[in-house]
């Protein structure tokens, strides 16, 4: 297959599909990666992630340097210019190469007549860069987040919102989960050191290791054999709070892509686990993860609001509900989230979460444990959600995580720590 090698035009098309069409980067990027040589895949990914991370700034610069926006069939050029700005600001690509390749990208998207315009805007930016960046530093766009999300974070975290925003704008660390059925964490860290890499254990999550420097999975000792899995430290907290035991009947609801399903089975290899997700396509990832780790679980497609459709009258000893959410705790890992979410989505998600909680609670045995988890930092989906659930559910009691007035444990994203995550552990009386 002929490889299309103008990365800049491909990156522009990817960002356009995210911002204009509401597609997630995880769906858009893989087919575009197939169009470039292996050596260029990392740069294409960097351009896509980087432009989405700094989109507010790049948009602000375009508005300063162009008298009117590019619209209609020329819209891709708008994003191509952003790709040019991003290279000049944030990459080690030599400026002359960044300019030449970005201008040439106009040919790939069949807009050769706009090469002069692109060249002119990028050169004007180079001339005015210092003045423009000084002005940008005092603008509302400097937070690199949509205004509605900044307001929500300010309201929820009056003293911490800037730290959360700064964390969201950083590159994420790479966390791994050591498969305790194969090695102790210390034992695997020794293998990692033998392979010339360094890792650090997490103080609270017993299987979690942070790599000093992110590495491709094929370089990790025993990855193909299932000795280790890529999973953020905070996501590993779910199994810690769930505390699964061998012989128990356990439901992992909203299970795709299967990271938590397999963690449950590493902690309790003889548990009977049912993994359910509404998205048939994403369930293929659950099967892949189970296969790589040599594990078995019952995998079903189903809507969490209607458990009778996928589990009949079954009841479970433990339930993990990793609820659908705004994903505002994992923005540093998925910067497209900032531009895919809308303010109105939060109330809709909170309503969906409440419906799933109410539907699945009767499926928990008396004395059983339900862990409600999200990768959100917004109280409407987390603390407020559990507070109102406890008020309307007399046989539910909070355990280990917070108080009835301030229920749950909220992890915030930050530095080398895990992602933003919320957990509430509930016991059925």
UniProtKB/Swiss-Prot annotation:
A biological process from GO: rRNA base methylation
Gene Ontology terms for molecular function: RNA binding; rRNA (cytosine-C5-)-methyltransferase activity
Name of the top EC class for this enzyme: transferase
Listed GO CC annotations: cytosol
InterPro entries associated with the record: MeTrfase_RsmB-F_NOP2_cat (IPR049560), MeTrfase_RsmB-F_NOP2_dom (IPR001678), NusB-like_sf (IPR035926), NusB_RsmB_TIM44 (IPR006027), RCMT (IPR023267), rRNA_ssu_MeTfrase_B (IPR004573), rRNA_ssu_MeTfrase_B_ent (IPR023541), RsmB-like_ferredoxin (IPR054728)
Catalytic residues (positions): 375 (nucleophile)
Polar residues compositional bias, start-end: 400-412
Positions of S-adenosyl-L-methionine binding: 254-260, 277, 303, 322
UniProt-listed NCBIfam families: PRK10901.1, PRK14902.1, rsmB
Name used for this protein in its record: Ribosomal RNA small subunit methyltransferase B
Species per Swiss-Prot/TrEMBL record: Salmonella paratyphi B (strain ATCC BAA-1250 / SPB7)
Taxonomic lineage from the root: Bacteria, Pseudomonadati, Pseudomonadota, Gammaproteobacteria, Enterobacterales
Gene: rsmB
